Amino acid sequence: MKSYVEYIDSNGYKYATDSSGRIANAQGDLQLGEGIRNPYAQRTVGGADRLPTDDGGHLIGKQFNGSGQIDNLVPQNSGINRSGGEWYKMEQNWANALNEGSKVKVDITPNYSGNVARTHSFNVDYWIDGEKFIQIIMNP
């Protein structure tokens, strides 16, 4: 992706890239839906910096109409991304809130070391009906 670009996708989610063209931020008001997966992008995101234990993790989840393209994917440890993991549980919390009629807003910042394409952690600020929550998730 290009460096220092801000864009809004077709679902209203806003993204920004850093000097290396990596996703620096993703934010928006979540909506339930069914995004489309891109298995190739999920298998290859992160390139040489990707670990064998990584998934191509969606910053804005597929169940929220998140894009399946590289504009919304980062190398994410499968232990946090899959069922039972910390990211998975957080997304389930958001989905449950939306199903109950609440409004959910997210502001996700992937954290990188140097010029590597793999994040070491995520700072996630989110609001459910205006109440703010902060979660820091490590990406081992």
Predicted features and spans:
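Domain-level detector of nuclease and nuclease-like folds
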Residues: 5-140
